[in-house]
Design a protein with these regions (language model features):
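Bacterial signal peptide processing site
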Residues: 21-23
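Bacterial N-terminal signal peptides that target proteins for export
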Residues: 1-9
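A short, Trp-centered hydrophobic/proline-enriched beta-strand micro-motif
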Residues: 41-49, 156
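N-terminal helix-cap/turn-to-beta initiation motif at the start of protein domains
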Residues: 28-44
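Central antiparallel beta-sheet cores of small beta-barrel/beta-sandwich binding domains
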Residues: 31, 48-133, 145
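Glycine-rich, aromatic-bearing surface loops/beta-hairpins
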Residues: 143-177
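C-terminal motif of bacterial Sec signal peptides marking the signal peptidase cleavage site
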Residues: 16-19
Length: 177
């Protein structure tokens, strides 16, 4: 009987962890026009958003974005200004590997990001090493979904997971300048 309870507990844990780590849903305000990364992220735009941790911590930011497309690689420079005064620059290099499929790198991404078209939205999944006070860092998984709104702005919602558990989320709107 003890073996039964161990197996049942392990199964319950696995199902709970899977539920916590699910990818973000398609934003409800999304249009029916497909988001196409190499079209919709090219040029200058501004993003306004917020990171929310399950602990209640919130961190708002604005980012100036500049994207270029050379026929194979989308380069997206992101200049962040956080509400606490911190500034940061990150640069995505997303290389098209097939129709609607990309692999990508960024300074803080561990390994390669995977991007893919999923109906009218674009999904991007990647691991990031976040700095910690002890200097060792903490690896978390981001799962982004990008969708166009009817007005042409881009909605980007992301879940942040750690060992399969959802620990935060990011929501932002990207507007053309």
């Amino acid at each position: 009987m003890n073996q039964f309870f161990r197996v049942a507990a392990l199964a319950a844990f696995a199902l709970t962890a899977q539920a916590c780590a699910t990818r973000p849903p398609v934003p409800s305000a999304a249009s029916t026009t497909p988001f196409v990364a190499e079209r919709d992220l090219v040029g200058a735009s501004v993003a306004r958003g917020e990171f929310r941790a399950i602990t209640g911590v919130r961190r708002a930011f604005t980012a100036q974005l500049n994207g270029t497309w050379d026929g194979v690689t989308l380069t997206l420079v992101e200049d962040f200004a956080y509400d606490d005064g911190e500034r940061d620059r990150k640069t995505w290099h997303l290389r098209r590997t097939g129709p609607g499929r990309f692999t990508g790198t960024r300074e803080d991404v561990v390994g390669e990001a995977q991007g893919y078209q999923d109906g009218d939205v674009f999904r991007l999944e990647y691991d990031v090493m976040l700095p910690t006070e002890n200097g060792r860092g903490r690896k978390v998984r981001f799962r982004d979904v990008l969708a166009l709104r009817a007005d042409g702005d881009i909605l980007n919602n992301a879940t942040v997971g750690w060992y399969g558990f959802r620990v935060g989320s990011v929501s932002l709107v990207i507007e053309r300048e």
